[in-house]
From Swiss-Prot:
Identification of the protein by name: Flagellum-specific ATP synthase
Gene of this entry: fliI
Cited Pfam families: ATP-synt_ab, T3SS_ATPase_C
Source organism: Rhizobium meliloti (strain 1021) (Ensifer meliloti)
Catalyzed reaction equations: ATP + H2O + 4 H(+)(in) = ADP + phosphate + 5 H(+)(out)
GO-annotated molecular function: ATP binding; ATP hydrolysis activity; proton-transporting ATP synthase activity, rotational mechanism
Amino acid sequence: MAREAAEKTATSTSLAALAGLVERYANPDFAIAPGGHVQTISPGHYTVSGLSRHVRLGDFVAHKSTTGTHLGEVVRVEPERVVVCPIEPGDPIGIHDVVIRKGAFRIAPTDNWCGRTINALAEPIDGLGALLQGDIRRSIANTAPPSMTRKRVEQGFRTGVRAIDIFSPLCLGQRLGIFAGSGVGKSTLLSMLARADAFDKVVIALVGERGREVREFIEDTLGDNLSKSVAVVATSDESPMLRKMAPLTAVTIAEHYRDKGDNVLLIVDSVTRFAHAIREVATAAGEPPIARGYPASVFTELPRLLERAGPGAEGAGTITAIISILVDGDNHNDPVADSARGILDGHIVLDRSLAEEGRYPPVNPLASISRLARKAWTPDQEKLVARLKSLIHRFEETRDLRLIGGYRPGGDADLDMAIKQVPVIYDVLKQMPGERPAFDAFTDLANALKAAAMGNQPGAAGLRGRG
């Protein structure tokens, strides 16, 4: 009996030891991985020999130096060497330092990430302690769901911004771009849209933003939505690799919540700085420019990022993406803006001249388009908006004529109506960031037009600030 007990004890001990080994080597931190050595060092990248057969584009590697282990991404693979861009600037790199393959970069989001601010590596930067990790690790370089497995986009929602809810209404699962030059009000409009109450979760990627604005945006703008929001931050002084990764990390977090059935709002400010980061990395890898200094990889990565947003499969939720595009020199046909416009489901154009007049948000209702507007409008609303756009167009095209005194009342009924009603429409569209979101934009507009028709036009100004 004693012998049998000893054999059972030895067997159980061996099994426990074997299980421990399996668990240990299943962990990527302990697994045996191929490695190489640093061969050359240049500003923004370094080359490694001995890894060409073992890595793929986009794989992460760990560079071991005298100060610790630092991450890098493989951006070019050649027969005898690979080119690696370090993730963080200032990493100390020496010739013959050891470099180990890590594979795809993965994160494990959970609901506990809500209310937190993290960097592009999914590390907390808000001083609130460590992040709890989920059960499923997701690659940030994931692909979009197959098109035929996705639900249709059907349900409209209220943003609370009258200029958008009337002229360019949105649907859950839509991807919308906000196009504007610098200093026109993109971030301000995004902050107004972030307060929409139609979403279970909000994920925000702040890419290349000024450091002083990050805390203001998160704490002042989100308000009650802060508890259901995750902010991913890569400021302008961080490396191009981190600025490139931030939107990918954000959309991966949004995918986690969508797959659980949540309706998610994804805000990226801005995709242009994401494109600039890709350009910096591609230039370091030796990729030639093809369009105004942008390499081909920019126009490959943009659709990969944007197509990951949208509706999920049956039973899943949606990702409604609202992204900002900074147009260089107010040129709305620059390569990044033109490429993004062709991918997105609509675009809001912010006009600098409207901002200079003090009309906020400076949304140009004639140039802004929502490709899914018909799913959000009722038939009567669609007819009304078509009529409103006609009046606004008539009002704007005759502005010079009226300035030189060439307008005579009674000669053109449409122009007479435009002159009476368009200023009222413009007044209704004005909203300041601190105002409560509009509950029903069409009702506000109808009330203002009725007041103007009764000769009480000043009362229309009182609409601003009503919820």
